[in-house]
UniProtKB/Swiss-Prot annotation:
Annotated family: Belongs to the UPF0262 family.
Signal peptide: none
Pfam families attached to this UniProt entry: UPF0262
Source organism of the structure: Rhodopseudomonas palustris (strain BisA53)
Name by which UniProt lists this protein: UPF0262 protein RPE_4483
Lineage top rank: taxon: Bacteria
């Protein structure tokens, strides 16, 4: 007897909101990057809170102290679960990610294509590290695939971006 694989077509995030009180507003460039990160995440993702029936879900992100808050709800606003993740494991990764992104944007103006490609490979490697860390931190709480982890890490990074 085989067990059917779960139907994940409804296990997804359909909307993301940011807690303006804890995250705050930023300049137009950062707001634009946040909007892109949210769009990319909502466009394609796998997001299944452990123990919850199938979605779709909405996600409200905020910062409480030194923690990232994931407030997960149903489309109608009914609470599903809230998780608080320490930001500490992400601080070094986000800092390294911004440093290499700065190098990348500077290199685009003056460096050779080989140098730009090498920097971009490093940037992708750090992004992958952040994505794996996020998957590990959410393990047992929310099931996400690697691409969703990448999109969420992008959004978390943009939330840290002070410009």
């Amino acid at each position: 007897m085989t067990t059917a694989a779960p139907d994940d077509s409804k296990n997804c995030i359909v909307a993301v909101t940011l807690d303006e009180e804890s995250i705050g507003r930023s300049g137009p460039d950062i707001e634009h990057e946040r909007a892109i990160a949210i769009y990319d995440l909502v466009e394609k993702n796998l997001f299944a809170p452990e123990g919850a029936s199938e979605g779709p879900f909405t996600l409200h992100l905020g910062i409480t102290g030194n923690r990232l808050m994931f407030d997960i709800r149903r489309e109608d606003g009914t609470p599903v679960v809230a998780h608080l993740l320490s930001l500490s494991p992400f601080r070094r990764i986000v800092k390294d990610y911004f440093m290499i992104c700065d190098s990348y944007y500077q290199a685009i103006r003056t460096a050779t294509p080989d140098k730009i490609e090498a920097i971009d490979m490093g940037r992708r490697g750090i992004h992958d590290e952040g994505s794996r860390t996020l998957q590990e931190r959410l393990a047992g709480k929310v099931r996400i695939d690697f691409e969703t982890a990448r999109r969420l890490f992008t959004l978390i990074s943009v939330l840290h971006w002070k410009g």
